[in-house]
């Protein structure tokens, strides 16, 4: 079933009306530490909003990616995952942690499904998809980020294959 679920970082349900989604909710990514934001304010941003949109309800089991609906599908709307280190270690200015993207990928797709990221950046979503047994398709306009994402995907594919051979 194509286009089951959609995630948009920095967007909210209030901004999603034109998408005509079958269902939507706001998720909050708790980054675990305060960011810079507006330094004139006494409060610093520690979170990022994520719009979750659903076109068609999924009936796949979230325990192993196959079968009937399981309780794992329903989770809290606050995702607590530390953001990548900002001291020159990040591969992209808005890089997302693979663990965060893995949670989203596994919640919204099954084994062998295709995960599409039209703004791949450093490839975190694609890596999460590969490591979760999904097929990954990504697009990135910046050549340097494309190269980074490609290298990360190749490495993830090797890790995934090695893990499969261990079973």
Placement of each model-derived feature along the sequence:
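Class I S-adenosyl-L-methionine-dependent methyltransferase module
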Residues: 154-167
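Core catalytic lobe of class I
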Residues: 1-146
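Generic alpha-helical hydrophobic packing signal
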Residues: 135-138, 153-157
